[in-house]
């Protein structure tokens, strides 16, 4: 899933500015798995960061009622990108309201392929994983886990996160390249 890179980005943020200064937000939709939400919560608890769950379903339903015809015409990309953009709105609202820096979670593999959403997962003032290829992000996850375990702490990224299939949870069958 896409969860692993968000968890690694949270680890980078907590290491850079201290866990007391990091807010993690899970923003599930109708396509999100409970497992992904649980994994995000696990990481937040392991890192000691503030964590909120804010569903995008209400916003998504309202938008579908207003422009649903446009979202269902042709490719499913429009509908899938709307979900990412709604998440970007929530992240930026928190950043603006609380004087925080939003971070984007894209990696070099995604950015090189254009596999990202403008005003969605690209929303943020900094992209800490932007110079790392996807496999390097996985390696960094291992580094954060090993470091935590070496200090007698809980590994911040669960094994289930690192071993589950890469699904985007933006539709019933969307893959992450």
Regions found by a protein language model. Name each.
Residues 1-18:
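A phosphate-binding catalytic loop at a beta-strand-loop-alpha-helix junction
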Residues 4, 169-177:
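Single conserved hydrophobic/aromatic residue that forms the stacking wall/gate
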Residues 8, 23-26, 50-55, 60, ...:
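Structured core elements
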Residues 10-11, 15, 38, 92-93:
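Solvent-exposed alpha-helical segments within well-ordered globular domains of core cellular machineries
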Residues 13, 38-40, 67, 116-120:
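Short, glycine/charged-enriched secondary-structure capping and boundary segments
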Residues 17-18, 72-150:
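Active-site adenylate/phosphate-handling loop in enzymes that bind or generate adenylated species
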Residues 21-75, 84, 110, 156-165:
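A conserved beta-strand->alpha-helix junction
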Residues 130, 149-171:
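Mobile late-domain/C-terminal helix-loop "cap" segments
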């Amino acid at each position: 899933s896409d969860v692993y890179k968000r968890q690694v980005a949270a680890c980078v943020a907590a290491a850079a500015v201290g866990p007391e200064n990091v807010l993690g937000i899970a923003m599930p939709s109708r396509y999100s798995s409970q497992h992904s939400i649980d994994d995000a919560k696990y990481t937040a608890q392991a890192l000691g960061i503030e964590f909120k769950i804010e569903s995008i379903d209400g916003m998504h339903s309202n938008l579908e009622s207003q422009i649903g015809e446009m979202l269902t015409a042709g490719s499913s990309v429009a509908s899938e990108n709307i979900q990412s953009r709604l998440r970007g709105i929530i992240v930026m609202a928190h950043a603006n309201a609380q004087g925080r820096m939003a971070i984007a979670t894209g990696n070099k593999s995604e950015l090189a392929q254009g596999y990202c959403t403008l005003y969605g997962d690209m929303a943020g003032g900094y992209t800490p994983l932007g110079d790392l290829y996807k496999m390097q992000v996985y390696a960094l996850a291992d580094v954060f886990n090993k470091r935590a375990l070496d200090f007698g702490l809980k590994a911040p990224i669960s094994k289930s996160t690192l071993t589950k299939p890469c699904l985007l949870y933006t539709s019933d069958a969307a893959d992450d390249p």
